[in-house]
């Protein structure tokens, strides 16, 4: 994993404790307990919200706050006759960050969405980008890379992605904790007001 300065590696229970503390749901006095009589399981609701928050963070937060790995050795690459490379993305990759094929003169950091107007020129042999101005289209489970010169093998120099930790933990930069929604306990969907 890259960019590990000030990175936290938290279990789900450790992250749950952070959320409870930020929301004021953790007693501050040792020996005190909080009990509910309405049957609401606050921990389950917080865990669900916590998982949603982390999934959203992986999809949209700046990559310097998230676990980023080079997955180039885990890609399945296929090249078409027209030089377009299809890369099958490994399941832990949430989103691509920076990719580069060996012959390219620069890397790609903007990944177009299928159907975007900018993709129209990519499939035309006369307007398709080459090694000086490469392009990529992100289909989620596969990425099309435009394009490779004739006779070149599809060899990746890098395929950096934001990755989801396989063990269900939370890996993130400590400053990302500031994005936890802590307005008040009632603002979390489905949580009753705590008195």
What are these regions (language model features)?
Residues 2-133, 137-139, 145-195:
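Glycine-enriched, solvent-exposed interface loops adjoining structured elements
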């Amino acid at each position: 994993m890259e960019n590990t300065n000030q990175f936290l590696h938290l279990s789900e229970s450790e992250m749950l404790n952070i959320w409870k503390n930020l929301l004021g749901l953790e007693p501050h006095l040792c020996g005190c307990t909080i009990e509910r009589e309405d049957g609401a399981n606050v921990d389950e609701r917080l865990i669900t919200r916590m998982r949603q928050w982390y999934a959203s963070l992986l999809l949209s937060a700046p990559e310097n706050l998230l676990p980023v790995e080079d997955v180039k050795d885990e890609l399945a690459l296929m090249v078409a006759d027209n030089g377009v490379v299809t890369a099958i993305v490994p399941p832990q990759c949430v989103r691509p960050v920076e990719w580069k094929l060996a012959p390219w003169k620069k890397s790609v950091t903007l990944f177009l969405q299928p159907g975007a107007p900018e993709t129209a020129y990519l499939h035309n042999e006369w307007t398709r980008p080459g090694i000086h101005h490469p392009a990529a289209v992100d289909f989620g489970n596969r990425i099309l890379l435009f394009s490779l010169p004739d006779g070149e093998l599809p060899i990746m120099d890098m395929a950096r992605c934001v990755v989801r930790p396989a063990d269900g933990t939370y890996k993130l930069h400590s400053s990302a904790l500031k994005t936890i929604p802590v307005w008040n306990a009632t603002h979390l969907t489905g949580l009753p007001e705590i008195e």
